[in-house]
């Protein structure tokens, strides 16, 4: 190590099950670890792209208060986004769509797409290497919402 190493990006989530469905099941990240803290009333989940633990995402879920009220998070585009390189942008977007995820910015150019997590975190997907040739149905799809 040269004095510093990137570890992870942490995002707060409001529903750990919906978030795991999105990040693990739909997006295809691998679950590295999960820690449920009864005393601290929180859950920490670490995930990473398959075969690459060097860039991890930490999902932090703060359990509801004893009265049942959940913590609300507000954010905006000032956070920016989390980005992943994928082997096949079209197959990745199709898998996400098959899991009910809206493709906010379809990969019309065969290179880039955006989706949002259940908590509204913008996720950029970039085709690894050269862009794929434009293909339907993606090439003619319009943007949906903000990304």
List PLM regions with ranges.
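Vicinal oxygen chelate
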Residues: 1-6, 30-83, 93-118, 128-147
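Conserved active-site tyrosine of GNAT-family acetyltransferases
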Residues: 19-24, 96, 120
């Amino acid at each position: 190590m040269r004095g510093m190493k990137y570890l992870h990006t942490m995002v707060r989530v409001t529903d750990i099950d919906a978030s795991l469905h999105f990040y693990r099941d739909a997006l295809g990240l691998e679950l590295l670890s999960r820690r449920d803290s009864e005393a601290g009333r929180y859950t920490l989940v670490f995930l990473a792209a398959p075969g690459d633990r060097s860039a991890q995402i930490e999902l932090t879920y703060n359990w509801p208060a004893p009265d049942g009220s959940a913590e609300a998070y507000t954010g905006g585009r000032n956070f920016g986004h989390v980005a992943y390189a994928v082997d096949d942008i079209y197959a990745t977007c199709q898998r996400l769509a098959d899991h009910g995820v809206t493709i906010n910015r379809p990969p019309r150019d065969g290179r880039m797409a955006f989706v949002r997590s259940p908590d509204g975190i913008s996720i950029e997907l970039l085709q690894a290497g050269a862009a794929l040739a434009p293909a339907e149905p993606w090439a003619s799809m319009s943007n949906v919402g903000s990304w």
